[in-house]
């Protein structure tokens, strides 16, 4: 076994320590009062204890970390392009896409709280070796793809804030250091880490709200855009993009692990229900805030660039320049305000990416090693290819936009491999006990999953029909599509037919 200089092993012996999302000493203690203890017998048969603002505060955190994936640079690029091309007309879709994302994330939280295990761990037990290895590789590829977008977003912001002195590759290296910031903060407890994310989300909110105020969008058009569904052939591609970038595969794995950072007695059914209630409230609040931030970005670009010659050429790389030309400087130049918001989005999403990478690797492989080493490995998987990308494409905006399209495709491909296992697992009484989802919830969840998968399938079909030509490439895409579809059908069929689970969520009635 590899050793450190002080003889502390890098890899943890499997017999010494079982792989878990959080050690008991790392979890946030939920304070119980005496009055509630007196009610334990009564509420144990009937639902959760009375609502408490103090408890809501203690449970607040995982939902906001989860919401970062709704605010990453990839989503911001989707927002600005939707606003520039479609104006206010897709705001209703942004709202409903966020609602669909909320439903998926609540299922992820439900799985984590009811079982005490996260999605990657459960997939390790649910599927045979070959299938779980495919799922692991797919999850890692999705994570690397999103991380490249996030790191490049931060690097673009750093380049703007340094007035071009620091090139993209230097920004990538600086962003890579967030791994060590993350490790430092994690050593001081999960609440400290959550506080940092609260600051980053607040920074995004203030920055983009300031831009919203500067742009002075039409209130009536904004309201109509939210309340009146409207879709045209000209905006269909952007509409598909809005829905496609809302659900991030790694975020589904992440949230099921984050909710285990609170101390919940899974032997008591009402304690589990209490935790689910508070997580539902805080996740809803977090995603409502993310919706507002996305709305700010969309409306700023709708106001400034809709029906202009620049509408189809705006991307993450040149957005700051176009904003500056449109809205000017002033005391606080909008270029730098945009860069500050973009930097907060990039930094927060890269840290959550590192976090998700630890859970994915540890869960699928039952790979028990020191947290700092595992974070370093998962970070390197994304940073090394990103540095190469930044060195090659530093001065090529068009090439970076093409790369971004390919990365979106990469993540779209992975979505079924997070959604289908999640829905299959939360539907099984052998795993969830009394917390399995009911028929109505199950039907709605599968309809949402089917809609998201079909939308992303449309994106893939359109992309490959435009980008791929020649017999060899067409043959390869055909073979890949057949294998891809077969594996999805396998996951669905196994989820319906496979039930030999000895494990069950513990809950007293």
Curated annotation (Swiss-Prot):
GO MF annotation: an example: metal ion transmembrane transporter activity
Cellular component terms per the entry's GO annotation: Golgi apparatus; plant-type vacuole; plasmodesma; vacuolar membrane; vacuole
Membrane topology, from the record: Multi-pass membrane protein
Transmembrane residue ranges: 56-76, 84-104, 133-153, 165-185, 193-213, 239-259, 285-305, 327-347, 383-403, 406-426, 444-464, 472-492
Biased amino acid composition, Low complexity: 1-12
Outcome of gene disruption: No visible phenotype under normal growth condition, but slightly enhanced resistance of root growth in presence of Cd and increased accumulation of Mn and Zn under Fe starvation.
Coiled coil: none
Inducing factors: By iron starvation and infection with the bacterial pathogens P.syringae and E.chrysanthemi.
One Pfam family matching this protein: Nramp
Location of the protein in the cell: Vacuole membrane
Chief localisation class: membrane
GO BP: any one term: iron ion transport
Keyword Chaperone recorded: no
Keywords per UniProt: Ion transport, Iron, Iron transport, Membrane, Transmembrane, Transmembrane helix, Transport, Vacuole
Segments of skewed composition (Acidic residues): 13-23
Tissue expression summary: Expressed in vascular tissues.
Family under the similarity heading: Belongs to the NRAMP (TC 2.A.55) family.
Cited function: Vacuolar metal transporter involved in intracellular metal homeostasis. Can transport iron (Fe), manganese (Mn) and cadmium (Cd). Regulates metal accumulation under Fe starvation. Acts redundantly with NRAMP4 to mobilize vacuolar Fe and provide sufficient Fe during seed germination. In association with NRAMP4, required for optimal growth and photosynthesis under Mn deficiency. Exports Mn from vacuoles in leaf mesophyll cells, making Mn available for functional photosystem II in chloroplasts. Involved in basal resistance to the bacterial pathogen E.chrysanthemi.
HAMAP family associated with the record: NRAMP
Protein name: Metal transporter Nramp3
Lineage of the species this protein comes from: Eukaryota, Viridiplantae, Streptophyta, Embryophyta, Tracheophyta
């Amino acid at each position: 076994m590899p050793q450190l200089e002080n003889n502390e092993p890098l890899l943890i012996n499997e017999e010494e320590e079982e792989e878990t999302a959080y050690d008991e000493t790392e979890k946030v203690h939920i304070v119980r009062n005496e009055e509630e203890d007196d009610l334990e017998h009564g509420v144990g048969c009937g639902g959760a204890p009375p609502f408490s603002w103090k408890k809501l505060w203690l449970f607040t955190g995982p939902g906001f970390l989860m919401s970062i994936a709704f605010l990453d640079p990839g989503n911001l690029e989707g927002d600005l392009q939707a606003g520039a091309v479609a104006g206010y007309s897709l705001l209703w879709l942004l709202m409903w896409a966020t609602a669909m994302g909320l439903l998926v994330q609540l299922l992820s939280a439900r799985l984590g709280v009811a079982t005490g295990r996260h999605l990657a761990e459960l997939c390790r037990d649910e599927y045979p070796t070959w299938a779980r290895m495919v799922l692991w590789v797919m999850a890692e590829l999705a994570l690397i793809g999103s991380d490249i977008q996030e790191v490049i977003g931060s690097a673009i912001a750093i380049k703007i804030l340094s007035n071009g002195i620091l090139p993209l590759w230097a920004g990538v290296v600086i962003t890579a250091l967030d791994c060590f910031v993350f490790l430092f903060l994690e050593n001081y407890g999960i609440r400290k880490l959550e506080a940092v994310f609260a600051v980053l989300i607040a920074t995004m909110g203030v920055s983009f709200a300031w831009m919203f105020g500067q742009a002075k969008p039409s209130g009536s058009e904004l309201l109509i855009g939210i309340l009146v569904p409207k879709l045209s052939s000209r905006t269909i591609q952007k509409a598909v993009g809005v829905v496609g970038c809302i659900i991030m595969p790694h975020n589904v794995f992440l949230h099921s692990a984050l909710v285990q950072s609170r101390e919940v007695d899974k032997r008591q059914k009402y304690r589990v229900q209490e935790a689910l209630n508070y997580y539902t409230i805080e996740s809803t609040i977090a995603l409502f805030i993310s919706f507002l931030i996305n709305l700010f970005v969309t409306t700023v670009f709708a106001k400034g660039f809709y029906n202009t010659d620049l509408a189809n050429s705006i991307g993450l790389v040149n957005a700051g320049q176009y904003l500056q030309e449109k809205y000017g400087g002033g005391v606080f130049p909008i270029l730098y305000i945009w860069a500050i918001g973009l930097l907060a989005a990039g930094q927060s999403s890269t840290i959550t990416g590192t976090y998700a990478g630890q859970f994915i690797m540890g869960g699928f492989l039952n790979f028990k090693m020191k947290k700092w080493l595992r974070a370093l490995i998962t970070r390197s998987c994304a940073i090394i290819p990103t540095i190469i990308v930044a060195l090659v494409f530093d001065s090529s905006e068009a090439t970076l936009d093409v790369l971004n399209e390919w990365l979106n495709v990469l993540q779209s491909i992975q979505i079924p491999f997070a959604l289908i296992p999640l829905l299959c697992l939360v539907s099984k009484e052998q795993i969830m006990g009394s917390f399995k989802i009911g028929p109505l919830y199950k039907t709605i969840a599968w309809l949402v999953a089917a809609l998201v998968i079909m939308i992303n399938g449309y994106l893939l079909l359109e992309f490959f029909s435009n980008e791929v030509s020649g017999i060899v490439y067409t043959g390869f895409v055909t073979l890949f599509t057949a294998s891809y579809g077969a594996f999805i059908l396998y996951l669905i069929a196994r989820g319906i037919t496979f039930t030999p689970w000895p494990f069950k969520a513990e809950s007293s009635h």
